A protein has these predicted regions:
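Cytosolic catalytic domains that perform sulfur/thiol-centered chemistry
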Residues: 1-282
């Protein structure tokens, strides 16, 4: 089944007993905005999981701005949200799918395949006249036992080994000006990991906020697909392991589930002063 589902698809299934809908809205720089938006209106039955409180570990010296939680800690959080090993999960946000894609990746990392991202997001759902509510769901905790997939994850040592290795392609998912080092609004150093190519994550969607077709995605991600077809490894990163996830999801949708996420991403890379930095190159 496709990892992206439509609003109409969700509407037809939203009251199924084995479904958990997760509201992932979150705004960088306004950490309270997502939960406030959820309290104001959300899809009926949805639970709220916060990017920084639930889907990330506390920030330390290394690991980036949104470190991965320990697998058992993350599994316990999902269980408290009513997500068990047999639960179907649909995630949504209003940030172009990056937070929902982070939840999709995290669940798959823990071995849970029955997880999807709703196309377009909550604003489109509400604008389309679909039902919304301000009532909170009564959550019945579930049992979630993780079955970790370590092959989905790349760490800083993996990326260091990739430097100069023709068998590995690094893919930077940030905007072109951040990749080039022309500006850096979030991190203390600007630029990118040497040898990386740039494929901005927002380009997996069209102007209307809907995910592009398979053909359009293949065109957008052509260099990555070509590399993987040649047997090369692809490691995708962004600023903190969130906005890279739509690129990872798009590649998975196109039949390339072996792609890796560098979860610490740029903010982890620059926390090591010895790591090299490049600017103004493709």
């Amino acid at each position: 089944m496709e990892p992206i589902v439509s609003k109409r698809w969700l509407l037809a299934r939203m009251y199924e007993p084995n479904l958990v809908i997760v509201d992932c809205r979150f705004e960088l720089g306004r950490p309270e905005a997502g939960s406030a938006a959820y309290d104001a209106a959300h899809i009926p039955g949805a639970v709220y999981l916060d990017l920084e409180e639930d889907l990330s570990a506390p920030v330390t010296e290394h690991g980036g701005r949104h470190p991965l939680p320990a697998p058992d800690t993350l599994a316990a959080r999902f269980a408290r949200a009513g997500i068990g090993n047999a639960t179907r999960v649909v995630a949504y946000d209003d940030q172009g799918g990056m937070n929902a894609s982070r939840l999709w990746w995290l669940l798959r990392w823990l071995g849970h395949d029955d997880v999807y991202v709703m196309d377009e997001g909550f604003a489109a759902w509400q604008a389309g006249g679909y039902p919304v509510t301000a009532e909170r769901r009564t959550v019945v905790p579930a049992a979630f036992t993780p079955s970790l997939r370590p092959h989905m994850l790349a760490g800083v040592e993996d990326v260091r080994r990739a430097l100069g290795d023709p068998g590995v392609l690094l893919v930077d998912s940030r905007a072109a000006d951040r990749f080039a080092g022309l500006q850096e609004p979030l991190d203390v150093k600007a630029g990118h990991i040497p040898g990386a190519i740039n494929r901005f994550w927002k380009q997996v969607q069209g102007d209307n906020g809907s995910w592009k077709s398979d053909g359009e995605l293949r065109e957008q991600l052509a260099p990555v697909i070509a590399a993987m077809d040649e047997g090369r490894e692809a490691i995708v990163y962004c600023g903190s392991g969130v906005s890279a996830c739509p690129n990872v999801l798009a590649l998975h949708r196109l039949g390339y589930p072996q792609v890796k996420l560098y979860a610490g991403s740029w903010s982890d890379w620059i926390s090591y002063p010895e790591n090299p930095i490049a600017t103004n190159e493709e």
